[in-house]
From Swiss-Prot:
Identification of the protein by name: Small ribosomal subunit protein mS41
Annotated organism of origin: Yarrowia lipolytica (strain CLIB 122 / E 150) (Yeast)
Targeting presequence: 1-24
Function: Involved in telomere length regulation.
Gene, per the UniProt record: FYV4
Location, primary (coarse class): mitochondrion
GO cellular component labels: mitochondrion; ribonucleoprotein complex; ribosome
Subcellular location: Mitochondrion
InterPro entries reported in the protein's UniProt record: Ribosomal_mS41, SAM_Ribosomal_mS41
Pfam families linked to this entry: SAM_Ribosomal_mS41
Keywords in alphabetical order: Mitochondrion, Ribonucleoprotein, Ribosomal protein, Transit peptide
């Protein structure tokens, strides 16, 4: 025998799509130079490529590429802008340091190191 179970009396979930702009962090920056100083990694040297803070804040990765900014710096700036737009604390994230010659060379470097100890 099959039993029919009544459907729930609750309406389907309602999805709200926001059309407002992203809520930026409470920290505000006067110029692009201030932001680039805050994020560190010597990105302040790129401040001359941006006339205003709004130009940097609303930039896309392709905009930064057109300005001649290298991929590593572009990726770092875009990550920090993403954090800023999501209200996260802005701080310098130091570059990682390779151990044992990096992932690809690790086995070779460790083998040479161990061979040199004997």
């Amino acid at each position: 025998m099959l039993r029919v179970v009544a459907k729930a009396q609750y309406p389907a979930a309602v999805r709200c799509f926001s059309t407002s702009h992203a809520a930026f962090a409470k920290v505000s920056f006067e110029s692009s130079e201030d932001f680039l100083k805050k994020i560190g990694r010597d990105t302040v040297k790129l401040a001359e490529k941006f006339e205003t803070w709004d130009e940097l804040k609303n930039s896309t990765s392709s905009d930064l590429k057109e300005k001649g900014i290298e991929a590593r710096d572009r990726r770092y700036i875009m990550t920090q802008l993403y954090r800023y737009k999501n209200g996260e604390k802005i701080r310098e994230i130091p570059r990682g340091k390779k151990t044992w010659g990096g992932e690809r060379k690790r086995n070779l470097v460790q083998a040479l190191f161990k061979a040199g100890q004997n």
